């Protein structure tokens, strides 16, 4: 169930970051901010749930090849999500300081990284 929920969260975050990107291209800065905020919240929620999943796991990284593979793969993906969340938080700060243009490369790079 947890894997399905995490997948759903990440798919929704892809929708919200795309919403933010399209809003930015249309100079709709309020919707861009909303999309960014939703995406960051979903990224943080995903990270929280992944941490819970690690704490509740009945195996460790040292138990077997399955444990090693599981923690390595999900750990790298979790790190990717955390870095992407930080990128998007920086975009929110830049957005609030009114330094965004319709095609702000920093935002576009963060959105590419997120996908």
Curated annotation (Swiss-Prot):
It catalyses: 4 Fe(II)-[cytochrome c] + O2 + 8 H(+)(in) = 4 Fe(III)-[cytochrome c] + 2 H2O + 4 H(+)(out). The chain crosses the membrane at residues 32-52, 70-90. Its EC number is 7.1.1.9. It comes from Artemia salina. The gene is COIII. Component of the cytochrome c oxidase (complex IV, CIV), a multisubunit enzyme composed of a catalytic core of 3 subunits and several supernumerary subunits. The complex exists as a monomer or a dimer and forms supercomplexes (SCs) in the inner mitochondrial membrane with ubiquinol-cytochrome c oxidoreductase (cytochrome b-c1 complex, complex III, CIII). The keyword Isomerase does not apply. One of its GO terms (molecular function) is cytochrome-c oxidase activity. The lineage of its organism: Eukaryota, Metazoa, Ecdysozoa, Arthropoda, Crustacea. Component of the cytochrome c oxidase, the last enzyme in the mitochondrial electron transport chain which drives oxidative phosphorylation. The respiratory chain contains 3 multisubunit complexes succinate dehydrogenase (complex II, CII), ubiquinol-cytochrome c oxidoreductase (cytochrome b-c1 complex, complex III, CIII) and cytochrome c oxidase (complex IV, CIV), that cooperate to transfer electrons derived from NADH and succinate to molecular oxygen, creating an electrochemical gradient over the inner membrane that drives transmembrane transport and the ATP synthase. It is a multi-pass membrane protein. Pfam families: COX3 (PF00510). Keywords: Membrane, Mitochondrion, Mitochondrion inner membrane, Translocase, Transmembrane, Transmembrane helix. It is an enzyme of class 7 (translocase). GO terms for cellular component: mitochondrial inner membrane. This is Cytochrome c oxidase subunit 3. The keyword Signal does not apply. Its main location: mitochondrion. Belongs to the cytochrome c oxidase subunit 3 family. It is found in: Mitochondrion inner membrane. GO terms for biological process: mitochondrial electron transport, cytochrome c to oxygen. InterPro entries: Cyt_c/ubiquinol_Oxase_su3, Cyt_c_oxase_su3_dom, Cyt_c_oxidase-like_su3, Cyt_c_oxidase_su3-like_sf, Cyt_c_oxidase_su3_a-hlx.
């Amino acid at each position: 169930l947890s894997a399905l929920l995490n997948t759903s969260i990440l798919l929704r975050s892809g929708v919200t970051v795309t919403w933010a990107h399209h809003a930015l291209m249309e100079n709709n800065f309020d919707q861009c901010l909303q999309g960014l905020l939703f995406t960051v919240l979903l990224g943080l929620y995903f990270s929280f749930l992944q941490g819970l999943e690690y704490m509740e796991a009945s195996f460790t990284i040292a138990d077997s090849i399955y444990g090693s593979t599981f923690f390595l793969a999900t750990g790298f993906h979790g790190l990717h999500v955390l870095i992407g969340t930080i990128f998007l938080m920086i975009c929110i700060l830049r957005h609030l300081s009114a330094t965004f243009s319709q095609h702000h490369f920093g935002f576009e790079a963060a959105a590419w990284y997120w996908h």
